[in-house]
Amino acid sequence: MTFPISKLRVFVIAFFMMASVSVKAQQPGMQALIGQSLSKLQQPTPEAFLNSIAEMKRIDSMFPDSIQPKYQMALQSLNFSVMNPHAAQTDHLLAETEQTIAKMEQMKNSDPSDICTLRGFLFMVCIVQNPVQNGPRYYLNVMQDFEKALKLNPDNQLARQLQQKFLEGMRQQTGNQGE
């Protein structure tokens, strides 16, 4: 009688050990998939961005509780949109990105600095799409989001770079070359 119970215990213990190893192995697997996708952006063509976004969506469906695929999907969507503000896919990508950012905000392991950076970038892309209409509407949002991102994490290089690019672009648009 003890033999079947022992066998069952060994099976249960082995199952839980395999499950824990499998869970830990998912993270490196996810990182490898993300890295492979991003490596294809050596030539940042519109097609390369759209392919990367599609790959990030697949990775996100494989790892729905992870922030990283959502972050990369949003970031690549915004990169595509800022470089192609009037492309047919841009409005759809921006709407999806807004939803992705909202999902990320609800996740317990999200980085508030990254959320602010993405939101600021989203508003920045809206301004690039239509500066006359969206500039006055979103200028303050962009500035506040980048400032908040840098206040939360002074080492956030993406927020710093985007803020600098935004300020340079605004100076060029307003004709104010000095500061």
Q: Residue locations for each model-derived region?
A:
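TPR/TPR-like (Sel1-like) alpha-helical repeat modules
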Residues: 137-151, 157, 164, 168, ...
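Short coil/turn and helix-start
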Residues: 46-47, 83-92, 129-137, 172-176
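Hydrophobic, well-structured mid-protein blocks that either form specific transmembrane helices
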Residues: 94-145
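Amphipathic alpha-helical repeat scaffolds of TPR domains
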Residues: 27-40, 62-84, 109-130, 157-171
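Canonical positions in the second alpha-helix
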Residues: 59, 104, 148-149
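Helix-turn-helix repeat elements of alpha-solenoid scaffolds
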Residues: 42-56, 89-100, 136-141
